[in-house]
Protein backbone atom coordinates (compact mmCIF):
# COMPACT_ATOMS: atom_id res chain seq x y z
CA UNK A 1 0.00 0.00 0.00
CA UNK A 2 1.19 3.49 -0.62
CA UNK A 3 0.82 6.48 1.66
CA UNK A 4 0.65 10.07 0.49
CA UNK A 5 4.31 10.51 1.51
CA UNK A 6 5.33 7.98 -1.19
CA UNK A 7 5.96 5.24 1.36
CA UNK A 8 5.13 1.69 0.33
CA UNK A 9 3.97 -0.97 2.79
CA UNK A 10 3.75 -4.70 2.15
CA UNK A 11 1.99 -7.18 4.38
CA UNK A 12 0.56 -10.66 4.13
CA UNK A 13 -2.46 -11.54 6.18
CA UNK A 14 -3.96 -15.02 6.23
CA UNK A 15 -7.58 -14.07 6.91
CA UNK A 16 -9.53 -10.96 7.87
CA UNK A 17 -10.22 -10.41 11.55
CA UNK A 18 -13.30 -8.41 12.34
CA UNK A 19 -14.35 -6.88 15.64
CA UNK A 20 -16.70 -4.05 16.44
CA UNK A 21 -15.08 -2.49 19.49
CA UNK A 22 -16.31 1.06 19.87
CA UNK A 23 -18.04 0.99 16.49
CA UNK A 24 -14.78 0.47 14.60
CA UNK A 25 -14.06 -2.62 12.58
CA UNK A 26 -10.53 -3.94 13.10
CA UNK A 27 -9.74 -4.94 9.56
CA UNK A 28 -6.40 -4.41 7.89
CA UNK A 29 -4.97 -1.10 9.08
CA UNK A 30 -8.05 -0.02 11.03
CA UNK A 31 -6.61 -1.15 14.36
CA UNK A 32 -3.87 1.47 13.90
CA UNK A 33 -6.37 4.28 13.36
CA UNK A 34 -8.66 3.08 16.13
CA UNK A 35 -5.80 2.89 18.65
CA UNK A 36 -4.85 6.53 18.22
CA UNK A 37 -8.44 7.77 18.00
CA UNK A 38 -9.48 5.96 21.20
CA UNK A 39 -6.44 7.20 23.12
CA UNK A 40 -7.08 10.81 22.16
CA UNK A 41 -3.67 11.15 20.53
CA UNK A 42 -2.47 11.42 16.99
CA UNK A 43 0.62 9.67 15.68
CA UNK A 44 3.16 12.01 14.14
CA UNK A 45 5.39 11.66 11.10
CA UNK A 46 9.04 12.77 11.33
CA UNK A 47 8.07 16.21 10.02
CA UNK A 48 5.40 16.62 12.73
CA UNK A 49 2.39 16.13 10.46
CA UNK A 50 -0.40 13.74 11.42
CA UNK A 51 0.27 10.13 10.45
CA UNK A 52 -2.40 8.53 8.28
CA UNK A 53 -3.31 4.86 8.54
CA UNK A 54 -4.79 2.62 5.89
CA UNK A 55 -8.27 1.20 5.87
CA UNK A 56 -9.79 -1.59 3.84
CA UNK A 57 -12.63 0.72 2.80
CA UNK A 58 -10.84 1.63 -0.41
CA UNK A 59 -8.61 4.35 1.00
CA UNK A 60 -4.92 3.70 0.59
CA UNK A 61 -5.10 1.46 -2.46
CA UNK A 62 -2.53 1.90 -5.17
CA UNK A 63 -3.21 4.23 -8.06
CA UNK A 64 -2.84 3.16 -11.66
CA UNK A 65 0.25 5.37 -11.87
CA UNK A 66 1.91 3.54 -8.97
CA UNK A 67 1.26 0.17 -10.61
CA UNK A 68 2.56 1.48 -13.94
CA UNK A 69 5.69 2.80 -12.21
CA UNK A 70 6.35 -0.61 -10.61
CA UNK A 71 5.91 -2.33 -13.99
CA UNK A 72 8.32 0.10 -15.65
CA UNK A 73 10.90 -0.39 -12.89
CA UNK A 74 10.61 -4.17 -13.20
CA UNK A 75 11.01 -3.98 -16.99
CA UNK A 76 14.20 -1.94 -16.53
CA UNK A 77 15.59 -4.45 -14.04
CA UNK A 78 15.30 -1.95 -11.17
CA UNK A 79 13.99 -2.83 -7.69
CA UNK A 80 10.23 -2.63 -7.22
CA UNK A 81 7.73 -3.64 -4.57
CA UNK A 82 4.82 -6.06 -4.79
CA UNK A 83 1.51 -5.22 -3.15
CA UNK A 84 -0.97 -8.00 -2.51
CA UNK A 85 -4.44 -7.64 -1.01
CA UNK A 86 -4.92 -11.13 0.44
CA UNK A 87 -8.29 -12.70 0.93
CA UNK A 88 -9.22 -15.74 2.92
CA UNK A 89 -8.76 -18.84 0.83
CA UNK A 90 -5.78 -17.72 -1.23
CA UNK A 91 -3.54 -20.38 0.21
CA UNK A 92 0.13 -20.72 -0.57
CA UNK A 93 0.77 -17.09 -1.51
CA UNK A 94 4.03 -17.50 0.37
CA UNK A 95 5.57 -20.78 -0.72
CA UNK A 96 8.09 -22.83 1.24
CA UNK A 97 11.66 -22.67 -0.12
CA UNK A 98 11.76 -26.49 -0.27
CA UNK A 99 8.69 -26.54 -2.53
CA UNK A 100 10.24 -23.96 -4.85
CA UNK A 101 13.52 -25.90 -5.07
CA UNK A 102 11.64 -29.15 -5.73
CA UNK A 103 9.56 -27.56 -8.52
CA UNK A 104 12.68 -26.05 -10.12
CA UNK A 105 14.18 -29.55 -10.35
CA UNK A 106 11.23 -30.75 -12.47
CA UNK A 107 11.67 -30.77 -16.24
CA UNK A 108 8.49 -28.94 -17.25
CA UNK A 109 7.22 -29.96 -20.69
CA UNK A 110 3.96 -29.36 -22.54
CA UNK A 111 1.39 -31.85 -21.32
CA UNK A 112 2.68 -31.97 -17.73
CA UNK A 113 -0.26 -31.97 -15.34
CA UNK A 114 -0.28 -29.46 -12.48
CA UNK A 115 -2.53 -29.23 -9.44
CA UNK A 116 -3.09 -26.48 -6.83
CA UNK A 117 -4.96 -26.74 -3.53
CA UNK A 118 -7.04 -23.82 -2.26
CA UNK A 119 -8.98 -23.60 0.98
CA UNK A 120 -12.55 -22.36 0.99
CA UNK A 121 -13.35 -19.04 2.69
CA UNK A 122 -14.26 -20.74 5.98
CA UNK A 123 -11.32 -23.22 5.76
CA UNK A 124 -13.77 -26.14 6.05
CA UNK A 125 -12.61 -27.87 2.87
CA UNK A 126 -9.93 -27.85 0.19
CA UNK A 127 -10.61 -27.38 -3.52
CA UNK A 128 -8.08 -28.75 -6.01
CA UNK A 129 -7.64 -26.94 -9.32
CA UNK A 130 -5.96 -28.95 -12.06
CA UNK A 131 -4.28 -27.74 -15.22
CA UNK A 132 -1.89 -28.75 -17.98
CA UNK A 133 1.34 -27.05 -19.06
CA UNK A 134 0.44 -25.55 -22.43
CA UNK A 135 3.90 -24.56 -23.66
CA UNK A 136 7.35 -23.64 -22.40
CA UNK A 137 9.63 -20.93 -23.73
CA UNK A 138 13.07 -19.47 -23.19
CA UNK A 139 12.89 -16.07 -21.50
CA UNK A 140 14.77 -13.42 -23.47
CA UNK A 141 14.04 -10.31 -21.39
CA UNK A 142 15.70 -8.97 -18.27
CA UNK A 143 14.70 -12.14 -16.38
CA UNK A 144 16.66 -14.40 -18.74
CA UNK A 145 17.73 -17.54 -16.92
CA UNK A 146 15.06 -17.20 -14.23
CA UNK A 147 12.87 -20.28 -13.71
CA UNK A 148 9.87 -18.04 -13.01
CA UNK A 149 7.31 -17.37 -15.70
CA UNK A 150 9.01 -19.77 -18.09
CA UNK A 151 5.87 -21.72 -18.94
CA UNK A 152 2.17 -21.15 -19.49
CA UNK A 153 -0.56 -23.46 -18.33
CA UNK A 154 -4.25 -23.93 -18.96
CA UNK A 155 -6.84 -24.72 -16.33
CA UNK A 156 -9.66 -26.61 -18.01
CA UNK A 157 -13.17 -25.39 -17.32
CA UNK A 158 -14.24 -28.46 -15.40
CA UNK A 159 -15.66 -28.89 -11.95
CA UNK A 160 -12.78 -28.88 -9.46
CA UNK A 161 -12.22 -31.82 -7.14
CA UNK A 162 -13.49 -30.94 -3.68
CA UNK A 163 -12.35 -32.78 -0.57
CA UNK A 164 -14.20 -32.32 2.70
From Swiss-Prot:
Q: Which UniProt keywords apply?
A: Mitochondrion
Query: Tell me, what is one Gene Ontology molecular-function annotation carried by this entry?
Result: DNA binding
Q: What is this protein called?
A: Uncharacterized mitochondrial protein AtMg00940
InterPro entries in the record: ARF_dom (IPR010525), ARF_plant (IPR044835)
Give GO terms for biological process: regulation of DNA-templated transcription; response to hormone
Q: What else is known?
A: A stretch of 270 kb of the mitochondrial genome is duplicated within the centromere of chromosome 2 resulting in the duplication of the gene. The expression of this duplicated gene (At2g07677) is not demonstrated.
Q: Which GO terms describe its cellular component?
A: mitochondrion; nucleus
Main location per the UniProt record: mitochondrion
**Where, per UniProt, does this protein localize?**
Mitochondrion
Pfam families xrefs: ARF_AD
Amino acid sequence: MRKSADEMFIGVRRAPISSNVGGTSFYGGDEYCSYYQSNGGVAKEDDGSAKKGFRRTGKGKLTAEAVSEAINRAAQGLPFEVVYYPTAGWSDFVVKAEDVEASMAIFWTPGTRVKMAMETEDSSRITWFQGIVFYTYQETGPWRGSPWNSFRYKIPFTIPLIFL
